[in-house]
Curated annotation (Swiss-Prot):
Pfam families: tRNA_m1G_MT (PF01746). It is found in: Cytoplasm. It catalyses: guanosine(37) in tRNA + S-adenosyl-L-methionine = N(1)-methylguanosine(37) in tRNA + S-adenosyl-L-homocysteine + H(+). One of its GO terms (biological process) is tRNA N1-guanine methylation. The keyword RNA-binding does not apply. This is tRNA (guanine-N(1)-)-methyltransferase. PANTHER family: TRNA (GUANINE-N(1)-)-METHYLTRANSFERASE. One of its GO terms (cellular component) is cytosol. It comes from Citrifermentans bemidjiense (strain ATCC BAA-1014 / DSM 16622 / JCM 12645 / Bem). The gene is trmD. One of its GO terms (molecular function) is tRNA (guanine(37)-N1)-methyltransferase activity. It comes from the Bacteria.
Length: 249
């Protein structure tokens, strides 16, 4: 999986991309992350990559020519890469979006800055736009880091176990179940007995119900439209009943 990141501030990526899982994935050749300084494609001696907006207004706008040059240089080597723009105007980034991108041959991420990019970048080059949420960051670099991390962990072999991604929050539309490790008791809080029982069928059932319970409590909108299996539907009825009894107390 190849990521090409177009940015005005490539040094921002040194830490997040050179530690832990992403570093190991890169060392194994499972992912490749290339950083490209947009200013390298500027035309003047000052490497100008932004200018005042036509029509007036505050701030600066990223110029189309340097971004176009960077995209064309990258696409010349990886013509099938999908071009993504980080922007508050984009599609909300979620697990399903990350899965979509993980199936691409490569992804080019344009990190927006200032008041945004010249609209002609969108018109001529961008395949899709991504937003992390209803808030504004100082630039798209942090968003790009999030995208690389979320997509990379879905690439086969990146995680220690393929099951790690399979049971993540949102992988099946629900939040993840609670996790415990040693010690079995800490400050009066005990690990649920079922997890110590060795009964894998009952453990799986408990975990599934906990996914439902946690999702119902924290993100009930995620439950809309879920098509339950017969066994899941039975479990969810039990979870709803327990939740109603808890509220009634």
């Amino acid at each position: 999986m190849k990521f090409d990141i177009l940015t005005l501030f490539p040094a921002m990526f040194e830490g997040p991309l050179t530690e832990s899982i992403l570093k190991r994935a890169s060392d194994k050749g499972l992912i490749e992350v290339a950083l490209h300084n947009i200013r390298d494609w500027a035309f003047d001696k000052h490497a100008t990559a932004d200018d005042a907006p036509y029509g007036g207004g505050a701030g600066m706008v990223m110029k189309v020519e340097p971004i176009a040059g960077a995209i064309e240089a990258v696409k010349a080597k990886n013509p099938n890469s999908k071009v993504i723009l980080t922007t508050p105007c984009g599609r909300p980034f979620n697990h399903q979006f990350a899965e979509e991108l993980s199936r691409e041959e490569g992804v080019v991420i344009i990190c927006g800055r200032y008041e945004g990019v010249d609209e002609r970048v969108r018109t001529l080059f961008v395949d899709d736009e991504i937003s992390l949420g209803d808030f504004v960051l100082t630039g798209g670099e942090i968003a790009a880091m999030v995208i690389v991390d979320a997509v990379s962990r879905l690439v086969p072999g990146v995680l220690g176990s393929d099951e790690s991604a399979q049971y993540d929050s949102f992988a099946d539309g629900l939040l993840e179940y609670p996790q415990y490790t040693r010690p079995p008791e800490f400050r009066g809080e005990k690990v649920p007995d079922i997890l110590l029982s060795g009964n894998h069928a009952e453990i799986a059932k408990w975990r599934r119900k906990e996914q439902m319970r946690r999702t119902l409590a924290s993100r009930p909108e995620l439950l809309d439209g879920i098509e339950w299996s017969k066994s899941d539907k039975k479990l969810f009825v039990e979870v709803e009943k327990a939740n109603q009894e808890k509220v009634a107390r």
